[in-house]
Amino acid sequence: MLYHVEMFTIILLFGFSLADYCGSDQVPYGMEVHHSGVVRLMCSKPNCYDKNYSDCPERAESRHGCQKSNQWVGGFEKNIEGDLYTMCCEFEGLEKYAKVRYSDVRIRRGEFFEGEEKENDDGDVVKFDVIKDIRMHKDDEGQAYYNLTVLSFNCESIPDVKPAWYQKSQWPYFQFAKN
């Protein structure tokens, strides 16, 4: 019985090391490949992205990366054969607010990429990097490496539109009859 518990624990830990996920309310700004080959996403929620959410599927389904102009990587999963599946989250207007910063960042074992944030004088984030796509390749020795496409997301270009309910919630609010 103890053997079965140990095997289950090992399989469970191995499964967790093959996937990573940022969620619909965070963005991937970096990626790390450990010497052991374990890949991790670095996730963040910049303050200018506070009230925004991306639309993410339940699991990593795309074998061909995040190719649409309104998508970025929300997570990934490697199956037992070593194939990489990406979870492509959609954000309405991404093509308007973000431009390609790096189109081919290569990361191998023992390396990492960390995007940048730019702040204004008040300390608010006005630009940040987000990983749009991850593609896995193998070198001549069969070792996996990853190519990233990185966008620079400009928060200042997002219009600050107040929701429809905002004006009505300001006190005093009186409905005047029209004569």
Curated annotation (Swiss-Prot):
Keyword set includes Nucleotidyltransferase: no
Glycosylated position list: 52, 147
CC terms in the record's Gene Ontology section: extracellular region
Main location: secreted
Swiss-Prot/TrEMBL keywords: Developmental protein, Glycoprotein, Secreted, Signal
Signal sequence residues: 1-19
Domain of life: Eukaryota
Tissue-wise expression: Expressed in the trinucleate pharyngeal gland cell g1, seam cells and hypodermis.
Location within or outside the cell: Secreted
Function as written in the Swiss-Prot or TrEMBL entry: Intercellular signal essential for a variety of patterning events during development.
PANTHER family: PROTEIN QUA-1-RELATED (PTHR46706:SF12)
Protein name: Warthog protein 3
UniProt gene name: wrt-3
